């Protein structure tokens, strides 16, 4: 696969249909768990609580910045506010104009950027402490496993290069009752190999929240 197939031309990249699918869910169901592709509200919140736990020493409430890539309607910011985590300075970025518009309506004071992370130098030059990728690597639709893996690795390398402390992201587990062809199931050992080859070996796997997926933390 060439760089152009993944990161250019900007008008149409292999992962853009993922955004279109989420916009369809949102149009049908609105700003709730089903509108963002989740089956239950409980599972939705469990994921986002785990994303936030990438922040080490949270009890100390040290100030930090967090970049939410694929922020959607900013449900992670909803949770941050509900938990009173005022020490977190949040910024969201998304490819969908419709979802960014919804996020801005809910949080008019929020910092949201519309665009593709591969093209937005300004979000990386700010050097966020943490980068969270919420659910953008779980569904591959028509992308092959190789294409999806390449997309994920390129995005993770970009984020890890520019963050100060660490990143969090999730993928579907291989330990499931059955696998769906449109989802991205990654074995633990394969993920470990990818991380060691492209980021580092300072990582944590989280599969303790009752869903058929796992979340990965990678720290500097």
Please tell me what each predicted stretch does.
Residues 119-125:
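Short conserved loop adjoining the S-adenosyl-L-methionine
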Residues 178-220:
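Class I S-adenosyl-L-methionine
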Residues 1-33:
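N-terminal, positively charged/glycine-rich alpha-helical extensions of SAM-dependent methyltransferases
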Residues 130-149:
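A short SAM/SAH-binding and catalytic strip from SAM-dependent methyltransferases
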Residues 43-62, 79:
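Conserved alpha-helix/loop element of class I SAM-dependent methyltransferases that forms part
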Residues 67, 74-119:
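Class I SAM-dependent methyltransferase SAM/SAH-binding core
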Residues 163-171:
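Conserved beta-strand signature within the Rossmann-like core of class I S-adenosyl-L-methionine
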